[in-house]
């Protein structure tokens, strides 16, 4: 139904990694994604390693995958990579019930999210061309 999504075109100096259907709410995942946006990848990995958020490990694995994609698939220099984009999308929401008193039931929603990380190679400013 509807028209097909346009495929995102990456520039020559970019690489990405996507983690789909992560069992966390998009709001909570976005808090961790905001920690690494715009930072150098080594600094972002350090931030994620010492973050106390439960989902930081999954975000770290996705960032490491984006770095590996940049190095192996796009021949980019790992030392000059920054996190250009880290965005979160909604996925499915599983609905479950929770038994309450007097024979009643209430709904429990278990949300899922998607995470996309794009890394970009930048030139060093002090370098002579």
From Swiss-Prot:
Part of the 50S ribosomal subunit. The keyword RNA-binding applies. The lineage of its organism: Bacteria, Pseudomonadati, Pseudomonadota, Alphaproteobacteria, Hyphomicrobiales. Disulfide bonds: none annotated. One of its GO terms (cellular component) is cytosolic large ribosomal subunit. The keyword NAD does not apply. Coiled coil: none annotated. It comes from the Bacteria. This is Large ribosomal subunit protein uL22. It comes from Sinorhizobium medicae (strain WSM419). GO terms for molecular function: rRNA binding; structural constituent of ribosome. Belongs to the universal ribosomal protein uL22 family. PROSITE patterns: RIBOSOMAL_L22. This protein binds specifically to 23S rRNA; its binding is stimulated by other ribosomal proteins, e.g. L4, L17, and L20. It is important during the early stages of 50S assembly. It makes multiple contacts with different domains of the 23S rRNA in the assembled 50S subunit and ribosome. Keywords: Ribonucleoprotein, Ribosomal protein, RNA-binding, rRNA-binding. One of its GO terms (biological process) is translation. PANTHER family: CHLOROPLAST 50S RIBOSOMAL PROTEIN L22-RELATED, LARGE RIBOSOMAL SUBUNIT PROTEIN UL22M.
């Amino acid at each position: 139904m509807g028209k097909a999504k346009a495929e995102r075109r990456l520039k020559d100096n970019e690489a990405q990694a996507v983690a789909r259907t992560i069992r966390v709410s998009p709001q909570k995942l976005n808090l961790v994604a905001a920690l690494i946006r715009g930072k150098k990848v080594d600094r972002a990995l350090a931030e994620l390693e010492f973050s106390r958020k439960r989902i930081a490990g999954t975000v770290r694995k996705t960032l490491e995958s984006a770095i590996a994609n940049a190095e192996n698939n796009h021949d980019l220099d790992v030392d000059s990579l920054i996190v250009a984009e880290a965005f979160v999308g909604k996925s499915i929401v599983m609905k479950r019930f929770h038994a309450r008193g007097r024979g009643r039931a209430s709904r429990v929603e278990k949300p899922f999210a998607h995470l996309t990380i794009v890394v970009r190679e930048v030139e060093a400013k002090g370098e002579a061309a």
